Amino acid sequence: MDPVTLAVLKGRLEQIADEMDATLFRSAFNPIIAEAHDASHGLYDPVSGETLVQGKSGLPVFVGAMAFAVKAVIDKTAESGGVQPGETWIFNDPYEGGTHLSDFKLVRPFYFEGTLLSLIHI
């Protein structure tokens, strides 16, 4: 891939994550999320669980924990054939990417034309 295409794709992925942040913060009823921005978002590799891109407006403390949460979903679903279209995993287990009980994780697959492209973490 040439450097220009790579830069364009990188910028687009960053914009997607930033728009995820903005949408949640704008629509949140809870002032802790709406005003303090106590959340983070990211796109993750569906095989390894590694971070592809993350939003810039959320709290940095979640960024490290989010990859562990995504990896936990990948590991839990491996026996049943992996994450399937339409599934959403929501949990607050502090041993699987958690920080404390009031922080929950939401992981959902992103498919395009039947191909799993990434896992979305909110």
Tell where the protein language model's regions lie, with residue ranges.
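A charged amphipathic helix-loop-strand protein-protein interaction module that recurs
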Residues: 17, 60-94
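Short beta-turn/strand-loop junction motif enriched in small, turn-promoting residues
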Residues: 29, 94-97
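Glycine-rich acetyl-CoA-binding "A-motif" of GNAT/NAT acetyltransferases
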Residues: 116
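Conserved small/polar residues in nucleotide/adenosyl-binding loops
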Residues: 120-122
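A short, hydrophobic, proline-anchored segment that marks a local hinge/packing element in signaling
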Residues: 103-112
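Residue-level detector of beta-strand face positions
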Residues: 42, 88-92, 109
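Long, charge-dense accessory insertions within large macromolecular proteins
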Residues: 1-66, 70
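Short, Lys/Arg- and Gly-enriched loop/turn segments at beta-strand edges
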Residues: 97-103
